[in-house]
Amino acid sequence: MKEYQITVLKGDGIGPEIVDQAIKVLNKTAEKFDFKVNYQEEYIGGAAIDATGEPLPQKTVDSCKASDAVILGAVGGPKWDSLSGSQRPEAGLLGIRGALGLYANLRPAVIF
């Protein structure tokens, strides 16, 4: 059975709620197509600021780089609007895109 490592970045605001549903869909897909998914949850955005004081902890970057895929939820919200640019939740999103060499959100789903 094929096995995949996925880093889960729930983000903040509505992100956790949406990501939880995406994981349910992925788990059903794994059952149907006979593959296994191992999840590693890390912080990004406002949730990371609240937990670690920074929008993109190095641990998150390292986990994403070691994974086969990343599930990313929404990032940002009024709670963090008073922070400076480099400390805002959105800095985590830009940082992870840069660290992974990405420039756009890709939404099509592919079964391997």
What are the functions of these language-model segments?
Residues I23-F33:
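Short catalytic helix/loop segments, enriched in acidic residues and glycine
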Residues I14-V19:
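Short N-terminal binding/cap micro-motifs at the start of the first secondary-structure element
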Residues D20-I23, G76:
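Short, function-defining helix-loop hinge/capping sites that tune catalysis or transport
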Residues M1-G13, E31, K36-N38, Y43-F112:
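Anion-binding alpha/beta catalytic cores of soluble intermediary-metabolism enzymes, centered on
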